[in-house]
């Protein structure tokens, strides 16, 4: 069975708006969504959703219905994707990523780690998060900044993916870290990556949808919560996330497009958190808030 990409071609601004629509209608599904720049000079972008061939008819119908009010002029195009390990392929030849004191590298680049750097080795796998995306790098840089300015006794990495942020938090802070994900594959991959990086104690991994698990009350409240997911779920879970934050604690949020920043800030200001800092990387933002 092949993988299909359904997409619309438009401007950067409209692609971001279409991505918001996709996030809303596919929030409870496991479909990957993304925007991609096609032509910088002509401001041509694509907003895409990925699925298997047997799901195409249903996804197309839902997408067309959601787009017909504001974006009916944008045709939904289709591409059949070849059977390629895109994660592995995309990492071929990628240089190590440096963010603050952290360097994220593949096993083929161990010799490029410099003295004094905090090295985290992440190879291509089934879970998201290699450090090459602006949101992951932004979280790493913000983590280093928070560690310099505020005491942290424990931390939560919500939506851990490959585990890179949880591993980074433990290596930098040396405090108990809980790492959760809704995907059991991600949880397993993250635990494997932690062991590969020599982190065998101090990190707890759990498969948990949102905050509907006793693992949060058992391990929390948390001095630091890192959530690198998407803007819409971040806004939706703001009350539950803040309920698990310790007094005086910090929150690092990412997976947020620059134009979505104000909506996310409004959701967390409504929970009495204060904006401390925003980092900008390649159209994405990472936000630090405090209690």
Swiss-Prot record:
Classification via CDD domains: AdoMet_MTases (cd02440)
Signal peptide residues on this chain, from the entry's feature table: none
Gene Ontology biological-process annotations: methylation
Broadest EC class assigned to this enzyme: transferase
Residues that, per the record, bind S-adenosyl-L-methionine: 136, 159, 181, 228
Chief place where the protein resides: cytoplasm
Biological role stated in the UniProt entry: Methylates ribosomal protein L11.
Protein's UniProt name: Ribosomal protein L11 methyltransferase
Organism: Rhizobium meliloti (strain 1021) (Ensifer meliloti)
């Amino acid at each position: 069975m092949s993988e299909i990409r359904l997409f619309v071609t438009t401007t950067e601004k409209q692609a971001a708006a279409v991505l918001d629509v996709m996030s809303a209608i596919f929030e409870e599904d496991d479909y990957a969504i993304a925007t991609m720049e096609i032509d910088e000079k002509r401001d041509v972008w694509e907003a895409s959703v990925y699925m298997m061939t047997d799901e195409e008819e249903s996804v197309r119908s839902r997408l067309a219905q959601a787009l017909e009010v504001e974006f009916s002029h944008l045709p939904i195009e289709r591409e059949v994707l070849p059977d390629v390990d895109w994660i592995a392929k995309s990492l071929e030849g990628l240089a190590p990523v440096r963010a603050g004191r952290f360097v994220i590298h593949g096993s083929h680049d161990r010799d490029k780690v410099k003295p004094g750097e905090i090295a985290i080795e992440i190879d291509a796998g089934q879970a998201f998060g290699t450090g090459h995306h602006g949101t992951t790098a932004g979280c790493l840089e913000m983590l280093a900044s928070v560690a310099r300015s505020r005491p942290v006794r424990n931390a939560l990495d919500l939506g851990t993916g490959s585990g890179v942020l949880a591993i980074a938090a433990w290596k930098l802070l040396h405090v108990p870290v809980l790492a959760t994900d809704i995907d059991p594959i991600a949880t397993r991959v993250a635990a494997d990556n932690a062991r590969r990086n020599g982190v065998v104690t101090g990190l707890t991994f759990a498969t948990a949808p949102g905050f509907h698990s006793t693992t949060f009350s058992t391990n929390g409240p948390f001095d630091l919560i890192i959530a690198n997911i998407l803007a819409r779920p971040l806004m939706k879970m703001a009350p539950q996330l803040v309920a698990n934050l310790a007094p005086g604690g910090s929150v690092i949020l990412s997976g947020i497009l620059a134009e979505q920043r104000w909506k996310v800030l409004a959701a967390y200001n409504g929970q009495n958190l204060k904006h401390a800092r925003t980092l900008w990387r390649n159209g994405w933002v990472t936000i630090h808030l405090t209690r």
